[in-house]
């Protein structure tokens, strides 16, 4: 028996294990002093010196705190203790090794340096020093081990006591270092972001999440409950932008830029991931040591070894929990910063897009789906390389146990990795195609949402629904190719789990049987099985993580291609440069240069077209716009007036010639006013400083002051998406007020006064263009494009354009006036008359107040996680399909678990019995493993190609149907970003995240149940531990879910403003650039993006916290099992090996269950959103009854005491109206804005609510009929023409017109065929750039005239065309529908005389009706008064 006390010659060897004294269970003193003392000291000193140099340059932020003296006292005690240890070793030869003095001396130096670091860290850093805390935490137990060794040496008690005192002083230093100085120093403002102030211990334990979990458990979590993020995570940085053509992109240029922009965040996870890898591979060695310990009889010293084994299990498993937490936090930080970086780049690029190259619609897809995939790739980046390293290490260790048999498994592993890489590449390519299909669908969805009112009016909702569902089916078809690669990768990744042990152990057994007779012991079997489990898990991670990275790279390449698109550059030159050029090019030295202040815009030989292959719209234009006055550009519909203004604006580069403007800011009012989803005041002031007097003058000039007084919230009234909560006239006047307030020296007005009533128009013209008007009296140059000659008398200069886009005449009004009559016939629109005396101050009756612009019906029930969501989801996928899927998953689990049980029994057999049962061994391992593989493949096919595909189509159908069936007030009350989120993010979640979470949760849950049963059978007391810990973890899981669900909701809600702002800025890109508001919009983008970062990061951090709790659960269970085995010593090696092996797998299964179950709960939030949306959104359809086939056969309309309102919360728009309209009559409806004209027509279309009364058409009460059926029977020309990105042929088919010759003849009648034929004929894609506003109305009129019907409804159908075309189209309607009833809402009362009857409305009541010709001869007639008021 070795002596109890160790002598110096034994301890003065490197060891590392002492031999020849005590129980031989100890390190040698030399090993402890070199490896456990000097090495940590050297590392700490190096890091401390580097950190000191960094802190030295930083300012002092903490002063006058009592903690600092405590820290300095503690470190001085450490320094003194180190000196006493050195002193004792110098006088005690019996305990001094070769390294004792060196260790003590380095300790003294190190303590002094660390004390300096502590001083600087306290004064100049918010966070507790990680270097000091880690050093103290790691060396305190090492000092304890060193003291234990010294205590057992002869004459070693005094040095042992000195080392123990050193350890005690280090404990004091550790306590002082961990004190939260923000609170004690009363500097809470420095610690608003816990991630910046928390030390490494708090971060490892995720303590910062506890207040959030507690708040989320007690009350529904709100934004104010979330703490602030640190600056690096929350700040979205702007990047220098390259304008114009981009150089050829490098394949991974964007990836490199992101890496070098966030190098620390990308590299920070490496060290904790390596630690995690090291601790993971300690598990098989622990399994072997435990089985060795149990298999051997007890001897003296067994107790110490058992205690050491328990300590080793605690160190490894709890270490795994903490380093995994630190690693995942680092990965989350990298993901968060990349998300912010990419989102900001996409938004910044969207503001720079050249409209000729791209409209920017793809940016919405990239901002959601693509960024999401890049995030996942970044999150899995370090797991991917670590998995490859893990496979290599695992194979090396397996080879050490199985010998050459391990080489056989190498082929399977290599093949799996090669196939995984190949299929990952294919998956990336298929995913890009899928993303393109999603982008195409979302582009059309955005167009539908913008034109929803026109779609409903024309009864096109069923056709639009079919079109979008066809797009969805095409998208799903492309997704199947990606899903097939995913199935292949998932199946391949689990091949190693089922076949590696079978192949490796079978070959080993075969070789052992024939050669050395070596048996497969329980120690070797379960050590190798643990290694196989780690390798199999790593192979799964390799394939899944590589696929995630490849898919992320594919999305990154899409983003990079988007970022490398040609950006907008101002093609205009400075007017000064143009003047110098003119001077230098003058002949004979005679200067033709004008005084710079005389010319504001100079156009020289300019031709312009919207596409490279298209025909020129403006041809060889040359003119000068005089400074400081009004220049009118006049011409017929489609002549290129708007195009010319876009050229002057710089939004469109001329194909030839030069454009020169004064170096000044430009104000721009588009033909369709762009109104942002902000308040009226913010729309007018924008990015400019606020000046009260200027603001009031702009409001008064545009007749907005009284309107604002009548609004409840005044000028703080939100305008809504595209100005939905203000009237059409108010949109025009807000845009005009914006131009006036800007004080720009160049103002461009693109026919923006169309649709205003006469008095309002006269007021505005007098306020801004009269001799003392705001624009006339200011040093401002105004260019107004119009088809009307009534603005010509106000002009200082006139430019006339013919139908071919050529300038036919230019000059002053005096020069043009003699030719006015001929020009009116050839070029201009004749004077028409507005319909009303003045525009009302209240909102247009056809628009709704924006009471809840960001309202979302999300998670009323689903946010609380009721089981009804699961029941509803299972009902959607089908209960039988779910049972089949569950059965297949169960087959897979049985196929994985049963061979392990058999191996535990087989390894306990004798050599001969093992040899005799080899055939059954091969059969069970290969047969059952193959069954598991087939079951897994079948389950994946069943889920991804059957269940997921069907639910993808169904969920889109539900969202689309609910949206199209929603009442009009829904679209005014709900932000477009919220609705678009349903078609993008919610469907993205249900398409991929939900199926993956579903299969992961099901597989891991079944596997966990099986492993718990195995562990309980092999270690009975562990069953109680499993039950107790499972209850605790269950409570925490529920505690966690309340918060995580709400965080998911907040994440989605915070993302909606980002999408809304993106859509808003893209819609008004020309206006934003004109006013120079791009920087302002970038700041707004930064604000909404930074707000969206907070819930996203905390959602990811909540998942890390949950993983930490699961790891701690597994560590506790492993500790319980090994403690029971050590104490009882009545378990066989095979049983303990099976139990410990399953604990390793159980840990992965528990983490998998919790992770995937939580992911399932969170992703089911999207299902809950869909369910709640479909159940809670009010449908406009109250009846499914179809009218008779021939209805309406006469077109007779009867209103009987009808009261109409847009919402029950609003007063009626029309009250107690009774009206009879005879079949075949042609009725014009006029009145001031807000009088109820459009409401009357929309009531026939079911777009407003009938509070009382009955509306009948041909004696049929229309409230009893299906609204889509009613609308489809009418011919409707809406005020806002619908434009979709489809071909002319497909567009016509949407309205039931398929005869191509009929379509061509109709287009020829309206004069559009020549334009369309040049653009590709019926295959030409319709877009906002294809047609001008007037041509859109002509196109809508063409389709209307091709449709048959007895009732024709027209709402301002010709407001953007010239008078000749108006007359032509009106006559075309009369000729096409001679026997049909025609109702036409119009402001242009001069055209009403051709109708049979005119109906005049005021305040929702009929004030007059009759023959318009007769009424004009009655001086007291209201209609005659309106007509006279419209004369100029």
Swiss-Prot record:
One of its GO terms (cellular component) is plasma membrane. The chain crosses the membrane at residues 30-50, 60-80, 100-120, 160-180, 266-286, 306-326, 376-398, 403-425, 487-507, 519-539, 877-897, 924-944, 997-1017, 1021-1041, 1107-1127, 1136-1156. Its main location: membrane. Residues 601-829, 1197-1428 form the ABC transporter domain. One of its GO terms (molecular function) is ATP binding. It is found in: Cell membrane. Disruption phenotype: Results in a significantly enhanced level of extracellular gibepyrone A. Glycans are attached at residues 605, 677, 1130, 1216. ATP binds at residues 635-642, 1231-1238. Keywords: ATP-binding, Cell membrane, Glycoprotein, Membrane, Nucleotide-binding, Repeat, Transmembrane, Transmembrane helix, Transport. It holds the Pfam family ABC_membrane. Induction: Members of the velvet complex, VEL1, VEL2, and LAE1, negatively affect GPY2 gene expression and gibepyrone A product formation, whereas SGE1 represents a positive regulator of gibepyrone biosynthesis. InterPro entries: AAA+_ATPase, ABC1_TM_dom, ABC1_TM_sf, ABC_transporter-like_ATP-bd, ABC_transporter-like_CS, ABC_transporter_C-like, ABCC_6TM_D2, P-loop_NTPase. It is a multi-pass membrane protein. Residues 279-550, 882-1161 form the ABC transmembrane type-1 domain. Gene3D superfamilies: ABC transporter type 1, transmembrane domain, P-loop containing nucleotide triphosphate hydrolases. PANTHER family: ABC TRANSPORTER ATNG (PTHR24223:SF399), ATP-BINDING CASSETTE SUB-FAMILY C (PTHR24223). ABC transporter; part of the gene cluster that mediates the biosynthesis of gibepyrone A, a 2H-pyran-2-one metabolite exhibiting a moderate antimicrobial activity against Gram-positive bacteria and yeasts. GPY2 seems to have a minor impact on the efflux of gibepyrone A out of the cell, but it was shown to repress expression of the key gene GPY1. Belongs to the ABC transporter superfamily. ABCC family. Conjugate transporter (TC 3.A.1.208) subfamily. This is ABC transporter GPY2. It comes from Gibberella fujikuroi (strain CBS 195.34 / IMI 58289 / NRRL A-6831).
């Amino acid at each position: 028996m070795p002596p109890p006390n160790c002598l110096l010659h034994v301890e003065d060897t490197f060891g590392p294990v002492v031999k020849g004294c005590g129980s031989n269970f100890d390190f040698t003193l030399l090993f402890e002093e070199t490896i456990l003392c000097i090495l940590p000291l050297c590392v700490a000193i190096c890091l401390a010196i580097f950190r000191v140099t960094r802190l030295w340059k930083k300012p002092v932020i903490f002063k006058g705190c009592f903690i600092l003296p405590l820290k300095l006292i503690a470190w001085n005690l450490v320094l003194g203790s180190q000196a006493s240890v050195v002193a004792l070793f110098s006088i005690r030869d019996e305990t001094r090794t070769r390294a004792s003095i060196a260790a003590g001396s380095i300790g003294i130096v190190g303590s002094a340096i660390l004390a300096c670091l502590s001083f600087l860290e306290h004064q100049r850093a918010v966070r507790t020093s990680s270097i000091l805390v880690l050093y103290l935490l790691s060396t305190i137990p090492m000092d304890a081990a060193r003291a234990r060794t010294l205590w057992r040496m002869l004459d070693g008690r005094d040095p042992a006591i000195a080392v123990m005192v050193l350890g005690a002083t280090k404990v004091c230093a550790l306590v002082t270092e961990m004190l939260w100085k923000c609170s004690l120093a009363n500097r809470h403002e420095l610690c608003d972001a816990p991630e910046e102030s928390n030390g490494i211990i708090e971060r490892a334990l995720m303590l910062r999440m506890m207040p959030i979990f507690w708040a989320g458990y007690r009350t529904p979590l709100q934004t104010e409950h979330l703490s602030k993020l640190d600056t690096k995570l929350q700040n979205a940085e702007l990047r220098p932008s390259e304008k114009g053509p981009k150089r050829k992109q490098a394949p991974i240029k964007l990836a490199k830029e992101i890496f070098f922009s966030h190098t620390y965040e990308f590299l920070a996870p490496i060290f904790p991931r390596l630690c995690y890898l090291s601790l993971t591979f300690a598990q098989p060695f622990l399994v072997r040591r435990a089985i060795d310990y149990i298999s051997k009889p007890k001897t003296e010293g067994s107790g110490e070894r058992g205690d050491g084994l328990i300590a080793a299990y605690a160190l490894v498993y709890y270490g795994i929990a903490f380093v995994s937490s630190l690693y995942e936090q680092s990965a989350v930080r990298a993901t968060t910063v990349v998300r912010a970086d990419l989102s900001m780049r996409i938004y910044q690029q969207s503001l720079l897009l050249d409209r000729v190259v791209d409209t920017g619609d793809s940016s919405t897809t990239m901002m959601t789906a693509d960024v999401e995939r890049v995030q996942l790739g970044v999150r899995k980046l370090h797991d991917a390389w670590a998995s490859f390293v893990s496979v290599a290490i695992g194979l090396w260790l397996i080879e050490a146990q199985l010998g050459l048999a391990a080489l056989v498994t190498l082929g399977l592993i290599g093949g799996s990795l090669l196939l995984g890489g190949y299929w990952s590449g294919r998956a990336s390519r298929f995913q890009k195609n899928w993303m393109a299909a999603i982008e195409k669908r979302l582009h059309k969805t955005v167009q539908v949402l913008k034109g929803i009112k026109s779609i409903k009016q024309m009864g096109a909702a069923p056709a639009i629904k079919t079109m979008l569902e066809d797009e969805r089916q095409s998208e799903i078809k492309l997704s199947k190719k990606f899903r097939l690669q995913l199935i292949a990768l998932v199946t391949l990744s689990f091949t190693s789990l089922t076949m590696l042990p079978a192949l490796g152990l079978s070959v080993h057994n075969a070789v052992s049987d024939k050669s050395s007779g070596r048996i497969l012991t329980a120690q070797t079997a379960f050590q190798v099985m643990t290694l196989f489990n780690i390798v199999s898990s790593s192979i799964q991670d390799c394939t899944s993580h590589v696929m995630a990275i490849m898919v992320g790279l594919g999305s990154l390449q899409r983003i990079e291609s988007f970022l490398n698109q040609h950006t907008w550059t101002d093609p205009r030159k400075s007017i000064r440069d143009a003047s110098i050029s003119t001077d230098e090019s003058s002949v004979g030295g005679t200067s033709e240069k004008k005084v710079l202040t005389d010319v504001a815009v100079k156009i020289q030989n300019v031709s312009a077209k919207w596409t490279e292959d298209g025909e020129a719209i403006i041809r060889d234009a040359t003119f000068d716009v005089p400074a400081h006055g009004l220049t009118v550009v006049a011409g017929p519909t489609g002549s290129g007036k708007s195009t010319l203004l876009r050229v002057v604006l710089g939004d469109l580069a001329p194909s030839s010639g030069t454009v020169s403007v004064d170096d000044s800011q430009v104000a721009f009012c588009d033909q369709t006013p762009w109104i942002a989803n902000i308040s009226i005041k913010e729309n007018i002031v924008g990015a400019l400083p606020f000046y009260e007097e200027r603001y009031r003058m702009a409001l008064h000039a545009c007749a907005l002051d009284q309107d604002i007084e009548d609004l409840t919230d005044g000028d703080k009234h939100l305008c809504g998406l595209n100005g939905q909560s203000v009237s059409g006239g108010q949109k025009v006047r807000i845009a005009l007020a914006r131009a006036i307030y800007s004080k720009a020296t160049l103002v461009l007005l693109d026919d923006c006064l169309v649709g205003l009533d006469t008095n309002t128009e006269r007021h505005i013209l007098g306020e801004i263009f009269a001799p003392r008007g705001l624009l006339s009296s200011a040093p401002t140059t105004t260019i107004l494009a119009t088809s009307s000659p009534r603005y010509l008398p106000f002009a200082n200069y006139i430019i006339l354009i013919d139908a071919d886009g050529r300038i036919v005449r230019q000059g002053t009004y005096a020069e043009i006036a003699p030719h006015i009559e001929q020009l009116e016939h050839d070029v201009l629109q004749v004077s028409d008359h507005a319909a009303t005396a003045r525009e009302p101050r209240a909102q247009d009756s056809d628009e709704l107040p924006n009471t809840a612009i960001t309202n979302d019906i999300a998670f009323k029930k689903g946010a609380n996680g009721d089981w009804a969501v699961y029941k509803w989801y299972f009902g959607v996928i089908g209960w039988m399909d779910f049972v089949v899927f569950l059965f297949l998953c169960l087959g897979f689990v049985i196929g994985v678990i049963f061979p392990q049980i058999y191996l535990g029994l087989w390894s306990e057999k004798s050599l001969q019995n093992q040899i005799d049962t080899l055939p059954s061994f091969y059969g069970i391992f290969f047969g059952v493993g193959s069954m598991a593989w087939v079951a897994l493949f079948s389950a994946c096919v069943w889920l991804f190609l059957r269940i997921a595909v069907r639910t993808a189509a169904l969920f889109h159908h539900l969202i689309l149907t609910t949206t199209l069936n929603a009442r009009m007030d829904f679209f005014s009350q709900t932000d477009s970003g919220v609705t678009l989120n349903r078609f993008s993010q919610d469907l993205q979640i249900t398409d991929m995240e939900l199926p993956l979470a579903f299969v992961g949760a099901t597989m891991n849950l079944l596997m966990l149940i099986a492993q718990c049963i195995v562990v309980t059978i092999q270690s009975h007391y562990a069953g109680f531990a499993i039950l107790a810990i499972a209850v605790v973890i269950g409570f925490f899981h529920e505690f966690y879910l309340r918060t995580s669900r709400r965080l998911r909701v907040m994440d989605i809600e915070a993302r909606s403003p980002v999408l809304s702002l993106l859509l808003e800025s893209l819609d008004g890109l020309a206006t934003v650039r004109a006013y120079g508001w791009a920087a302002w919009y970038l700041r707004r983008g930064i604000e909404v993006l930074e707000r969206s970062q907070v819930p996203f990061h905390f959602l990811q951090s909540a998942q890390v916290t949950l993983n930490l709790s699961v790891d701690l659960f597994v560590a506790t269970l492993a500790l319980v099992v090994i403690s029971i085995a050590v104490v009882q010593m009545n378990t066989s090696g095979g049983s303990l090996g099976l139990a410990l092996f399953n604990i390793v797998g159980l840990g992965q299964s528990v983490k998998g269950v919790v992770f995937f179950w939580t992911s399932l709960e969170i992703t089911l939030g999207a299902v809950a959103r869909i369910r709640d949306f479909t159940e809670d959104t009010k449908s406009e359809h109250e009846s499914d009854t179809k009218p008779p086939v021939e209805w309406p056969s006469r077109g007779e309309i009867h209103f009987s005491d009808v009261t109409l309102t847009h919402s029950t919360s609003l007063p009626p728009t029309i009250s107690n109206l009774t009206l009879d309209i005879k079949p075949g009559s042609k009725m014009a409806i006029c009145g001031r804005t807000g009088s109820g004209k459009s409401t009357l027509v929309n009531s026939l279309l079911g777009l407003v609510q009938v509070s009382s009364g009955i509306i009948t058409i041909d004696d049929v009460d229309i409230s009893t009929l299906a609204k889509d059926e009613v609308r489809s029977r009418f011919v409707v020309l809406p005020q806002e023409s619908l434009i979709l990105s489809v071909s002319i042929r497909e567009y016509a088919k949407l309205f039931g017109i398929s005869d191509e010759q009929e379509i061509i003849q109709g287009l020829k009648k309206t004069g559009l065929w020549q334009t369309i034929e040049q653009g590709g004929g019926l295959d030409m894609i319709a877009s906002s750039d294809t047609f001008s506003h007037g041509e859109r109305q002509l196109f809508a009129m063409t389709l209307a005239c091709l449709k048959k019907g007895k009732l024709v409804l027209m709402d301002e159908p010709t407001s953007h065309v010239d008078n000749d075309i108006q007359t032509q189209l009106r006559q075309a309607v009369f000729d096409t529908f001679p026997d049909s009833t025609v109702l036409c809402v119009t402001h242009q009362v001069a055209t009403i005389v051709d109708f049979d009857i005119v109906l005049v409305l005021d305040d929702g009541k009929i004030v007059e009706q009759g023959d318009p010709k007769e009424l004009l001869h009655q001086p007291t007639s209201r209609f005659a008064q309106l007509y006279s008021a419209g004369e100029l």
